[in-house]
Amino acid sequence: MKMAIAIQCHTNSEQINRLINYFQDDYIDIYIHVDKKSNIISELDIKKNVYLIENRVDVKWGQFSQVDATLNIFKEIRNSDYKYKYIHLISGQDYPIKSLKAFKEYFLYQNSEFIE
């Protein structure tokens, strides 16, 4: 079961690198949208399962630009070579509270969508 992790971020490259390292798995790809105003890309630990969104948006908090950034991530995921069973959208400030094994196992046995 292949999953995609979509991350929107603008700061704190150390935290983004922690997320990248946490989600290292053959069945997980990571798509990262870095705010156009940000200069943290050169500090990110890009691995084989990490894809940077090229069409970056100048995101303004609470404005439609956040939706634009999200849509750009989803477009890139849709245009990839994989058909993912799940796509998880998280902020660069988030961090999972369960182990990667528990995270994967939870979704492995689900047979539903979480958005109607």
Language model region names:
Residues M1-E116:
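ER/Golgi luminal nucleotide-sugar-dependent glycosyltransferases, focusing on the catalytic module
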